[in-house]
Amino acid sequence: MSTRLSKLFVRTLREDPVDAEVASHRLLVRAGYIRRQAPGIFAWLPLGLRVKNKVEAIVREEMERIGAQEVHFPALLPAEPYQATGRYDEYGPGMFRLEDRKRAPMVLAPTHEEFFALLVKDLYSSYKDLPLSIYQIQDKYRDEARPRAGILRGREFTMKDAYSFDHTDAGLAVSYQAQRDAYERIFQRLGLEYVIVAADAGAMGGSKSEEFLHPTPIGEDTFVRSPGGYAANVEAFTTLVPESIPIEGQSAARVFDSPDTPTIATLVDLANAREPREDGRAWTAADTLKNIVLALTHLDGTRELVVVGIPGDRDIDLKRAEVAFFPAEVEPATEGDLAKQPGLVKGYIGPWSPEGPVLGSTSSTKVRYVVDPRVVDGSSWITGANVAGKHVLSLVAGRDFTPDGVVEAADVRDGDPAPDGSGPITAGRGTEIGHVFELGRKYAEALGLKVLDENGKLVTVTMGSYGIGITRNLALVAEATQDGRGLLWPASISPFDVHVVMTGKGDEIASASEELVDALDAAGLDVLFDDRPKVSPGVKFGDAELIGVPTIVIVGRGAVDGMAELWDRRTNERTPVALADVVGALTADR
C-alpha cells in the first residue's frame, strides 16, 4: 500500500515545541506524529497512529500466543467497585472523578482490575472454566500533578492490561510466568533494552511484583543491580541487616555538651575532639543516629508525626518513605507540626533524654518512632538528647530505646550490599515499560469472586495483573533510536517500510517514481511517496530524516539512466542501485 505525502495529513515543523523536555517529545511533534491539546493530553495524527497500531499489533500477537483473549471496557465507569476495594481513596487526587446527572459518582478509569474481576464473577462459577487470561488495549486516565516529557508521562495514555484467573496459587504462578515471558518477547521485538527488577506493589497490592525498566538517562525511576544478578527498583530494595550485638558490657549512655553542631559533620568533629572513642577509631557519620520528623496525611485526612531514625551518613529517600508508609501521603514536618510537639527539641531530637524515653508509642510524646534496619539491638549511637545543646553517647538500641518498628526509608547507594549476598549494587536510571503482579486474592475477596473447586467447595479465585504502556513504549523507542537529525524507527514499528523521495523535475523522473512505487506496493511493501511537486530536495531530505522511516529510496536525475539511490538511515550510507533492482534489494530478507 502506498501513501502520497502530498495527500497525507501532516505538517512538519522546523522549530522545537517550547515545552519539550526530551528528544522524543520534540521529534514526535516536529515530525507530525502528535499534537498537544492540553498539558499531558495529545492528539494522534496519521503517522503517529500507524506506529501506535504496530506496537499494539505486536502486543496482540504475543497475547494471543499465550492464549489470552481480548475484551474492551469503557473508560467511564461507576466508582462503586473502586470504593469496595479501597482504591477509590488510595488513588487520591490522581483519579479523575465526576458525577453523572443523577449524582452517581463516576471515574475515568486509571486501571480496570475491579471490572475484570466482576466480569468473570458474572460469567464463570466453576474451576473448570479456569485458567483464564483476558486483556484489553484501552486509554487510561490519571491526573498527573506534573505531566512531563510528552507522551512519556501524560494524563491520558494507552495501555495493555491483562488479567489472569486461577483457582490455585500454583495455577497463578504458571499464568504469571507465561505473561512475563510474553513481555520479554514484546520488548525484544520493539528493540527496547530492559531490566527486570523486583518492585513494590503500591496501590495494586498483591504478593509479588516485578517491573520491566528501560535503562535511559531520562528515566524517573532508580533501580539497582549486582554482579550476581540481583535487581530491584530502589523502592523495593531491602537493606542487608547486620547481626545484633551483645548488650552486656557496653558503656552506659552519657550526655555531653554539643553546642553549635547544626550538621552531622560538625557533630562528628566535636565528638572526635572532646569525646574520643575508647577503641582509638575516629567517630564517623555512620556512628550517629539522625532522627527525621515526617508528617503523614492518612486517607481519612488525619495528620500524624512520625520520627524515622537512620544512620547519620544516610539521607531520607522520600520515595522509599512513601512506600513504607503507604497509603499515607508523606512530607517533611513543618515548623507548625513541630510546634505542636514541644517535647521534640529541633536539632537535638532523639529517642531518649535524661528524663526517660521521648519517642515511641510508650514515651512521653507518644510520637511513633521507627528506625532503619541497620539499627539493630546492641548497636550504639551518638544522637540528640532532646535538650538544647546536648547529645548523648553510647545510646544502645534494645537497652536504652525500643523503636515501634523498622522501615526502609534511607537512601540506597552504589556499593551497598545486595540483600541476597550477590555483591555490591550499582544504581541506574530507567523508565517503567511493563509491570507484572501476582495480585493473589485481594480483589476477588473484596468483590466476592469465587468458583466451585474439584470438591464442590467455594474457593476464592486468585488473580494476576499485567500492564504494558503502549504509548510510553512508543515514546521510549523514539527516544532510544533517534539520531539528532530525526526519528529512526526500527522496522518492526516504522510507519512505512520504505520512503520514496522524488527529486528533480521532468516526466521521466515522475514516471520512474510512479512505476517504482507501484512495484514496491505490488511486492507487499508499505510505501510513503514524497511526490510534492513544489518542495525542494533539501526540504524533502530533511523531512525524510525527521519522519524516520529507516529505508529511503531517492529517485532523481539518475532515473533517466535507470538509476536510484538507497539511503540507509541507520548508517547514513547512500548506495547507487538500478531502478529495476530496488524491489529485489528491499525484499531479499523479508
UniProtKB/Swiss-Prot annotation:
Pfam families per UniProt: HGTP_anticodon (PF03129), tRNA-synt_2b (PF00587), tRNA_edit (PF04073)
Leader sequence residues: none
Segments forming a coiled coil: none
GO molecular function terms noted in the UniProt entry: aminoacyl-tRNA deacylase activity; ATP binding; proline-tRNA ligase activity
Catalysed transformations (reactions): tRNA(Pro) + L-proline + ATP = L-prolyl-tRNA(Pro) + AMP + diphosphate
Start and end residues of each stretch annotated as Disordered: 409-428
InterPro entries: aa-tRNA-synt_IIb, aa-tRNA-synth_II, aa-tRNA-synth_II/BPL/LPL, Anticodon-bd, Anticodon-bd_dom_sf, Pro-tRNA-ligase_IIa, Pro-tRNA-synth_IIa_bac-type, Pro-tRNA-Synthase_IIa_type1
GO biological process: prolyl-tRNA aminoacylation
Homology family: Belongs to the class-II aminoacyl-tRNA synthetase family. ProS type 1 subfamily.
Job description of the protein: Catalyzes the attachment of proline to tRNA(Pro) in a two-step reaction: proline is first activated by ATP to form Pro-AMP and then transferred to the acceptor end of tRNA(Pro). As ProRS can inadvertently accommodate and process non-cognate amino acids such as alanine and cysteine, to avoid such errors it has two additional distinct editing activities against alanine. One activity is designated as 'pretransfer' editing and involves the tRNA(Pro)-independent hydrolysis of activated Ala-AMP.
Domain comment quoted from the record: Consists of three domains: the N-terminal catalytic domain, the editing domain and the C-terminal anticodon-binding domain.
Subunit structure: Homodimer.
Protein name: Proline--tRNA ligase
Organism: Clavibacter michiganensis subsp. michiganensis (strain NCPPB 382)
